[in-house]
Amino acid sequence: MYYPVSSILIEFLVLAIVEKQDSYGYEISQTIKIVADIKESTLYPILKKLEKAGYVTTYTQEFQGRKRKYYTITPAGREHIPFLQAEWNTYKDHIDGIIEGSLRK
């Protein structure tokens, strides 16, 4: 099942992925596609945004004769994860509240 995702959730997923292991764009997109139907055209601007914000850095490495651009998390990226985790938890709590009937307007 695929769920709609916001760019902030994609940022969180990207940082969570590269926190565990350096990854290249296609690998990141395939991991996210396990739960969300995203396109590379959505992912790459977010990767660039994370790089510009200083949350990830990149390096190239050759693989089977081709260069791959790998993303690695920075200390600032690690520090940003708890904020994104809190945002995600709030979102989940609101969804659960609606489903359980405890959150209404």
Which residues make up each language-model segment?
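Generic recognition of well-ordered alpha-helical segments
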Residues: Q30, P75, T90-D93
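Amphipathic alpha-helical dimerization/coiled-coil segments
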Residues: P82-K105
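N-terminal helix-turn-helix DNA-binding core of bacterial DNA-binding proteins
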Residues: Y2-T42
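Short, hydrophobic-biased segments on the C-terminal half of alpha helices
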Residues: L47-K49
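Basic, amphipathic "hinge/linker" alpha-helix immediately C-terminal to the N-terminal HTH DNA-binding motif
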Residues: F63-Q85
